[in-house]
Amino acid sequence: MKGARVVALCDKNQEQFTAPTAGGNISGADTATDYGDAAIYDDFDAMLAEAKPDVISLTLPTPLHVPLTIKALQAGVSVLCEKPMALTAAECDKMLKAAHRAPNGAKLMVAHCLRFWPCYVYLKKLVDSKKYGNVVAASFRRFSAPPGWQKGTNWFADESKSGGVALDLHIHDTDMVNFLFGMPKAVTSTAAFDKNGAMQYISTLYDVGGPAVT
């Protein structure tokens, strides 16, 4: 990003900063990243107080989004928070209230990345311009193995912590429906579960008052 500078990084697991960055469901480098002169922390409060960042990118497990987002906003630091925003609507409301009250004009943005991918930006232009006419139907499909962001941990497999397939993965499609067609008038979902009760598949019909969207 032009004009931006990474001033600090923070992680309880300091090995994250010396190990190769490949992993998860997005390919990365096979060698350790050079973070230049960025300060390295293992304490979030210390980072806020000493590094005094203007903006932080919060890429932590979902249960940590609420407390650390609120803490940063209260310190006047803007937050780009990984999706999903939180596990419940009540928790989201807490984050929004903190953003409205934040000093220094600090802002909160949830990182729904697809809105900024070139192919989706182009799709949005086509829908809005009606270059090929009105959309009469739309279908989105998404397949993914569970990400392995942190080896040796299983928080993602615990739906009470991650939200599972519906909240962590399907949320991409829900966001794109809102982005392209606006807030649905009604939503109907069906799901399939494995023998342990974990959701493996979800299908949703969105009534947007126009095209049929699944």
Task: Report the location of each language-model feature.
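Active-site beta-strand termini and strand-to-loop segments that position acidic
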Residues: 204-211
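A short, glycine/Asx- and small/polar-enriched loop/turn
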Residues: 197-202
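Short glycine-enriched loops at secondary-structure junctions
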Residues: 62, 85-86, 141-145
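Rossmann-fold NAD(P)-binding glycine/threonine-rich loop
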Residues: 85-107
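N-terminal glycine-/serine-/threonine-rich beta1-alpha1-beta2 phosphate-ribose binding loop
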Residues: 1-75, 93, 101
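Predominantly a Rossmann-like dinucleotide-binding segment in NAD(P)-dependent oxidoreductases
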Residues: 105-106, 114-190, 195
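A short hydrophobic/small-residue beta-strand
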Residues: 79-80
